[in-house]
Amino acid sequence: MSNVFVQQPAIQKLLRDSAGLDVAGGDERFKAIIHRLLENICTLIDDYNVTEEEFWHAVNYLHELGGRQEAALLAAGLGLEHFLDLRQDAIDAAAHRETGTPRTIEGPLYVAHAPLAEGHARMDDGADAGEAMWLHGEVKDTEGRPVANAIVDIWHANTLGNYSFFDPGQSEYNLRRRIRTGADGRYSVRSIMPSGYGCPPDGPTQKLLDRLGRHGNRPAHIHFFVSAPGHKHLTSQINLNGDKYLWDDFAFATRDGLIADPVKVTDREIIAQRNLEGEHTEVCFDFTLCKALSADEEQRGIRVRAKE
């Protein structure tokens, strides 16, 4: 068949009735979105001659996806979360908005209300014998001036690629901290070097990726929310240079301007200044925040998050 079938009056009436287009009340924009979605699905079924067995397999897949709580993971893996970033970049460019540090995907593993420290904190609880990391940088505005009272919200995986809260083997808020900058705009944390990770091998996201001939791996990376009064909230993450998946991230999060170069520190004076036991890796990354045009721009986007 061709999409002429979907355009038949009986099918079009079914789609309009299903979306409530001719029913008073409800949300008109939402109705229009659902109508477009249903029409596109029906056209796809007709164009690709999707069988009943394939249709119900897809319905069951949605059950499995929700049961494993992997919907957000799949959204990242199919590039939809990255698409939102690219679209917002285009909107900002069309409006001639000033740019700072690039945005990139949040991912599904943020947990709200991490402990807040002034200027510096230790992120790890000492249970993971990973390589020590000293992460630091400066928050600046677009004129290069330090931003005081910025909140740098940081989270990353352990050496096994797992995140606290979602991994019952880790302590609460392990590898999660918020740092408030001082007048110098600087932040620093002691932590451990994170590992990249792969999608759960038995999960629905990896099952779909297998059908596409794709892997489900991410490079080692560190997540950030950076916010400050009067400035546009930034959601971003940095990927660590040298990882084999740096430019082959299944979640499409790697972007120019968001790659950090880990540096091995062996200088005993620096080690002593940082109160570390020995050699460690230093990661330096500065952030540039843009001015907010409204109070809403100072806040992170609304979505379901753990403990929020």
What is each of the regions a protein language model found here?
Residues 2-308:
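Beta-strand-dominated extracellular/periplasmic modules and repeats
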